[in-house]
Regions:
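Near-N-terminal "mature-domain entry" segment
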Residues: 57-124
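Divalent metal-coordination and catalytic microenvironments
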Residues: 62, 89, 136, 192, ...
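Short, contiguous alpha-helical
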Residues: 82, 90, 129-151, 221-241
Length: 263
């Protein structure tokens, strides 16, 4: 597996505009019990992106989990959740803030804008922003794309129809999505995306890249579901059995969040 030490993740804390308190799957909290939202996103394929667009020069901060650290057991154990969030995710936030220090225009961007404009970042900080900005966006969404078993709902009729059209059935989608995650060599992510014409597609990315990074990751669409397949996401519980982690992960997928992003 990919050596995570190459990504320089410190073990101490952040601070940032909160990611405005909830990676958007937040602004609709008043309208949905899951706290998921769809906010319009300029210059992207569809108005699906869930992240807020508010401007500020405050530092990014580590978002709170929408559930207890042990709430996803036995699929994801509490120790893994704690280390994953307070060490790995926290490190991405810390390193992103360091990279953006002295760049007030970039500090005024939301994290979705940073990802969308990743290919135009200054050369001196581009790699650091790509690794750590991607890591912050990806993890903030990952926490929202999960929910305690039995509380995440099921794919909506509209999403089910789109999955069936693209992959044959919802169950066949799960098989192909898991295959994308298993097939990702080293570290990375598996994604379900919505394209401009309303169809859905599966892709995977290396390291902390995501489909919002136009010019770096192209041809997939706007992400509506993502699964972390870095070893730190599962190794304590599943060791090297990534397929077992991906098979169990469906028990804690927050379909209510995915449905809201697809609608």
């Amino acid at each position: 597996m990919h050596d995570e030490s190459q990504h320089s993740e410190p073990h101490d804390g952040p601070s940032r505009r909160d990611f405005l308190s909830s990676v958007a799957l937040g602004a609709l909290a008043a309208a949905t019990a899951t706290g998921v939202t769809r906010s319009a996103l300029a210059n992207t394929l569809t108005p699906l992106h869930p992240l807020p667009q508010e401007k500020t020069t405050m530092a990014f901060t580590l978002p709170e989990l929408p559930y207890a650290e042990n709430a996803l057991e036995p699929t994801i154990d509490a120790l893994t959740m704690n280390i994953h969030r307070t060490k790995h995710h926290n490190a991405y936030v810390t390193n992103l803030n360091k990279a953006l220090d002295g760049h007030p225009t970039l500090q005024a961007m939301s994290i979705d804008e940073i990802c969308l404009n990743m290919n135009t970042m200054p050369d001196g900080i581009k790699t650091a922003v790509r690794n750590n900005g991607g890591g912050h966006w990806n993890h903030s969404m990952y926490w929202k794309w999960m929910a305690p078993k039995g509380s995440g709902g099921t794919p909506s009729p509209a999403l089910s129809a789109a999955l069936a059209k693209a992959f044959g059935s919802v169950e066949e989608f799960k098989v192909k999505f898991a295959a994308a995650g298993v097939g990702r060599f080293g570290s990375g992510w598996a994604w379900l995306c919505k394209t401009a014409d309303g169809t859905v597609a599966i892709c995977s990315t290396a390291n902390q890249d995501n489909p919002l990074m136009k010019g770096i990751v192209d041809g997939c669409g706007t992400p509506i579901l993502g699964c972390d397949v870095w070893e730190h996401a599962y190794y304590l519980h599943y060791q090297n059995r990534r397929p077992d982690y991906l098979a169990a992960w469906w028990d804690v997928v927050n379909w209510n969040a995915v449905n809201a992003l697809y609608a």
